[in-house]
């Protein structure tokens, strides 16, 4: 398993750095800013589908999924979301990234390993 180091980005949100690949999961200029702009503002909000279907290959940190959940609740829109990840993160790492707000800790999210 590859080492992953949590780093703060310029907007204050966290991302992961993989030294073996010399690669970050998100832009170091802002993980949340990048995901919000690309995935939500230019993707989800631009869709006219009543119930959008999203397939994310390379689920990564789950930030795109998290922002999608927030937008779905804000817009009262149903979204069918599937995320695939070959190397899923440990729950402890997800918690340390700090994306999940206290108001959502009641959620039980389904997972299935294939």
Where are these regions (language model features)?
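Glycine-rich SAM-binding Motif I of class I
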Residues: 62-66
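Acidic active-site catalytic centers that drive phospho-/nucleotidyl reactions
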Residues: 56, 85, 108
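Rossmann-like AdoMet
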Residues: 1-52, 69-103
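Conserved small/polar residues in nucleotide/adenosyl-binding loops
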Residues: 105-111
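Short, glycine/acidic-enriched loop or turn micro-motifs at the edges of active sites
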Residues: 59, 88, 111
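Conserved class I S-adenosyl-L-methionine
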Residues: 51-60
